[in-house]
Amino acid sequence: MERLLIVNADDFGLSKGQNYGIIEACRNGIVTSTTALVNGQAIDHAVQLSRDEPSLAIGMHFVLTMGKPLTVMPGLTRDGVLGKWIWQLAEEDALPLEEITQELASQYLRFIELFGRKPTHLDSHHHVHMFPQIFPIVAKFAAEEGIALRIDRQPLSNDGDLPANLRSSQGFSSAFYGEEISETLFLQVLDDSSHRGERSLEVMCHPAFVDNTIRQSAYCFPRLTELDVLTSASLKYAIAERGYLLGSYHDV
């Protein structure tokens, strides 16, 4: 039985090193899809590179934890910038949901301005779209726009409440991450999905070349290791051997 495998590289537009890593992992590896931060410092560079790589599917990486928002967000910013204090606001049930709704729409329109087309799908930086307060907003928006959505079903208490026309992969994994990156780990993710009977799977990754921006990230050198693994010829063969076809959210 053939299964769909989407290998999505997050953080397109974060930095030039990140952008080059994603393009390399697409051109010479198994990355089929990426998601772009429209407020990233290297987003224009990402747009330019993407023009020479038409096979790379591009979605939108909704950002509520980094950089400057596109709209005025007094309820979520400090000194005009976004940050990880969003977790505290979520715990206090104090998220400015109307502001978040407007920012989502603005980032979506900015994506279309930059890339000249709709994103293939939506996900988010640091998975904030899976917050219980935010998820219904993003799910409704994706369904209305006819685009797919990354769904990590583990935090969902009831995915029966999803919009009927919302598209997503059956499975999602963020396990290909950390200090123990290897081909074995990647293939274990596939085997676990197969055992669950999932016909489609998205695997999240972050391949990059290290530059000054990536050096400042808490997740730095493992991005290089990811790039090595994702461009391995033996991994591509092992994926096909397991009955997976590489694709994107266009195929969901």
From Swiss-Prot:
Keyword Metal-binding: yes
EC number from the UniProt entry: 3.5.1.105
Subcellular localization(s) per the UniProt record: Cytoplasm
CDD domains: YdjC_EF3048_like
Catalysed reactions listed for this entry: N,N'-diacetylchitobiose + H2O = N-acetyl-beta-D-glucosaminyl-(1->4)-D-glucosamine + acetate; diacetylchitobiose-6'-phosphate + H2O = N'-monoacetylchitobiose-6'-phosphate + acetate
Annotated Mg(2+) binding sites: 61, 125
Pathway involvement of the protein, from the record: Glycan degradation; chitin degradation
GO molecular function: chitin disaccharide deacetylase activity; deacetylase activity; metal ion binding
Entries under Pfam families matching the protein: YdjC
Keywords in alphabetical order: Carbohydrate metabolism, Chitin degradation, Cytoplasm, Hydrolase, Magnesium, Metal-binding, Polysaccharide degradation
Entry GO CC: cytoplasm
Cofactor dependence: Mg(2+)
InterPro entries tied to this protein: COD_ChbG_bac, Glyco_hydro/deAcase_b/a-brl, YdjC-like
Any one GO biological process: chitin catabolic process
Matching Gene3D superfamilies: Glycoside hydrolase/deacetylase (3.20.20.370)
Primary role: Involved in the degradation of chitin. ChbG is essential for growth on the acetylated chitooligosaccharides chitobiose and chitotriose but is dispensable for growth on cellobiose and chitosan dimer, the deacetylated form of chitobiose. Deacetylation of chitobiose-6-P and chitotriose-6-P is necessary for both the activation of the chb promoter by the regulatory protein ChbR and the hydrolysis of phosphorylated beta-glucosides by the phospho-beta-glucosidase ChbF.
PANTHER family with a match to the protein in the record: CARBOHYDRATE DEACETYLASE, YDJC DEACETYLASE FAMILY MEMBER
Family listed: Belongs to the YdjC deacetylase family. ChbG subfamily.
Quaternary data: Homodimer.
Protein name: Chitooligosaccharide deacetylase
Species for this entry: Escherichia coli O127:H6 (strain E2348/69 / EPEC)
